[in-house]
Amino acid sequence: KLSRFEGAAGQNLVFIHEEGGKLVRIVLLGVAEGDTADYQKAGGDIIAKVQTSGAKHIAVHGANLTAQHAAEVAYGATLRNWRMDKYRTKLPETSKPTVEALTVVAAPAEAGGHWTSYQAIAEGVALTKELVTEPANIIYPESFVERCQHLKELGVEISVLDDNEMAALGMRALLGVAQGSRRPARLLVMKWDGTGGTQK
């Protein structure tokens, strides 16, 4: 009552509990009659509360969650846990992320199937963030192409156009931008057949 926590969507409460001689941080998050966005936000809020707390493994009590909602919580947490800190040389120790894993405990068995799809999306989001966050001396046309080559293993069809090929296709605007750089231009084309090869 003192905390006024009633489980409303977006409401949270953090407290410390002693368990087996150890102090455990417990985060309560409200989703009310929440929709997909509420459960994903709840997952993100969990990480926001503990990301730099020193905790390495987070357990989410999922017994009262549907399989879909359990996967959504994990998805939101995964998205929120992404950070680009490798160039931050003066980051205080207490500001460094520590969370390495999150487990949704006692979730319905079907949650794993839902998570497979969400995990693929989360990995794609992380790759995109990495590519747009890296500085220009690290990610430039040629290195951008190189960073994406591993997508071939997933079935993505990749083709690359160089300066001459782009000029032959009349891509003068793109080449005009490239003239301001000492790096050669590249155009990466990616195709994904989501039908498993049945589409012609």
Where are these regions (language model features)?
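Short amphipathic alpha-helical segment within the helicase RecA-like ATPase core
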Residues: 1-200
